Amino acid sequence: MASGSNVEEYELDVEALVVILRDRNIGRNPLHGEIIGLRLTEGWWGQLERFQMVRLILQDEDNEPLQRPRHEIIPRAVNPHTMFVLSGPLAELQLAFQDLDLPEGPLRFGPLANGHYVEGDPYSRSYRPVTMAETAQMTRDELEDTLNTQSEIEIQMINLLELYEVETRALRRQLAERSSIGQGGISPGASHSRPPVSSFSGLPSLPAIPGIHTRAPSPPRATSTPGNIPRSLGDDNMPSSSFAGPSQPRVSFHPGNPFAEAEGHRPRSQSRERRRDIPSAPVISAPVPSAPPMIQYIPVPPPPPVGAVIPIQHIRSVTGEPPRNPREIPIWLGRNAPAIDGVFPTTTPDLRCRIINALLGGNLGLSLTPGDCITWDSAVATLFIRTYGQYPLHQLGNVLKGIADQEGVATAYTLGMMLSGQNYQLVSGIIRGYLPGQAVVTAMQQRLDQEIDDQTRAETFIQHLNAVYEILGLNARGQSIRASVTPQPRPSRGRGRGQSAPEPSQGPVNSGRGRQCPAPGQNDRGSNIQNQGQENSSQGGYNLRSRTYQPQRYGGGRGRRWNENTNNSETRPTEQSPQTPRPIQAGSGVRGNQSQTYKPAAGRGGRGNQNRNQRSSGAGDSRAVNTVTQSATSSTDESSSTTTAAPSGGQGN
């Protein structure tokens, strides 16, 4: 037998097939790819009718004739009304179709494989249930499917028989009424009870009621009143018939019958009482009239319930479209399984199978059966094996490592539990090596040791992992949150003696030590920039209190004790030469200039004005001055300046 995927192929004898066709007056040759239905009239199962479907393979893919033609089994039900069918015993058809045998399950019933019995159809009339020989050759699942189909067919046959029985009883009742009318004893319009069962002979009898005995029909007796007593006079005795009655009725109108209704009692006739007083007359019991046949309607079993409507569009809006790469589908499904259960709970494997097949409708070869979808774990494991192939269990670590690098440890743990059949000891030992850092390993081990057993640890592993990630400042994949934040440039702050950072310039820098004075209205802008710089500086590193006032020895000066109105009203030079000392304005004292001029330290030759310009211009938020650089600069200035620089240096003290 040559097998291609799941199709069973066997050898074909074309010459024997041509002989079979000629024996049945079919004047043509078999065709390549032709599908033929085989009607097996008898075989090892007995003289019962069974069906099989085959397809002829006479050419290869290049349309060249095969040296050894083949036929393949098609697992579909044969429909003799729409396809070509060959009939014959199994031994004769096996001459052409080698290794021919019965199909699996209910397909052997042919047109009845779907369980629908068609009244009047010749193939439905030839239905016969499976025999013991067939049952012995079936597997458990195959036998269940066959018996389910067989029970559906036989239930329909029972319903038809019951309908036939009802029609038969109605015909009996009509026949009894016509026979009684033909004897002249009862008028069609008169009220009367049912005729005795003895009036129609030859039909099947009804069951007798216990306690009511039958009697032989009595001959007509002579009466004092000429003619027959009509039924309307109250005589319970029916005119006897020449036909023999087979049985007793179920219900009668006799007053002594316990089955009679209370309001249906008929009064005794006086003529009957007079006859009972005559001693010479033999006592003959009256026949019990028949009751109408009781029609019992057995309700037809309800149709199978329609499956639940799956909101596939709503589910797809939550999960998104499946990946185009089939190898990414198992991971995608395992990650979205909780979301699917949240949108539409899957309570049965059949429902879970329908949802998965609907989501993966465009991926051929990934369709699942309810047996593959008992749980989400089994469904994901089946898809993983179909896309990646069968893998040994000792390679599960390599599989989970790739998943952990791509999707994170949580996803790797979930899929590992699915692929290993909920083997917590194996998966936890593998996942432990993929945790990001010893701190996570220690914290996880401490939390898991507090659980009762492995089942509880397996259920709470993801919760503990997310909690540890949150404590350590990691994201869902175990990566640092700080690394994901884009660093923002910020102005530097003074960090003490001998340390300074480059400050971003916010305007053209003029030559020399002096800087351009800010225009009126820029003081507020400079203070805002300074506050923003302090806020930005507190984002990184340690969160320390900003230094609002620096001591004089660090270049902070004496604080904001000058009069801002006076400073705004005074005119200051916009640019100073590093070689020329700042002249003293007329009409202002030395102490007044010192208080109005921001001088950080003594002997620094006009640096106070420069520091004030730096703070008001908003070029930087730092009040620190590099003392080492300033000392070197001051010494150079003192050696090259004129004698007017000495008083200004002394005034700084």
From Swiss-Prot:
Give the keywords, sorted. Capsid protein, Cytoplasmic inwards viral transport, DNA-binding, Host cytoplasm, Host nucleus, Host-virus interaction, Microtubular inwards viral transport, RNA-binding, Viral budding, Viral budding via the host ESCRT complexes, Viral nucleoprotein, Viral release from host cell, Virion, Virus entry into host cell
Composition-biased stretches (Polar residues): 564-579
Q: Which GO terms describe its molecular function?
A: DNA binding; RNA binding
Entry keyword annotation includes DNA-binding: yes
Record PTM: Specific enzymatic cleavages in vivo by viral protease yield mature proteins. The protease is not cleaved off from Pol. Since cleavage efficiency is not optimal for all sites, intermediary molecules are expressed.
Q: Specify where the region named GR-box 3 lies, as residue ranges.
A: 591-623
Q: Where is this region: Disordered?
A: 179-286, 482-653
Instruction: Sum up the protein's function in the record's words.
Output: Involved in capsid formation and genome binding. Shortly after infection, interaction between incoming particle-associated Gag proteins and host dynein allows centrosomal targeting of the viral genome (associated to Gag), prior to nucleus translocation and integration into host genome.
Further remark: Foamy viruses are distinct from other retroviruses in many respects. Their protease is active as an uncleaved Pro-Pol protein. Mature particles do not include the usual processed retroviral structural protein (MA, CA and NC), but instead contain two large Gag proteins. Their functional nucleic acid appears to be either RNA or dsDNA (up to 20% of extracellular particles), because they probably proceed either to an early (before integration) or late reverse transcription (after assembly). Foamy viruses have the ability to retrotranspose intracellularly with high efficiency.
Listed name of the protein: Gag polyprotein
Query: Gene of origin?
Result: gag
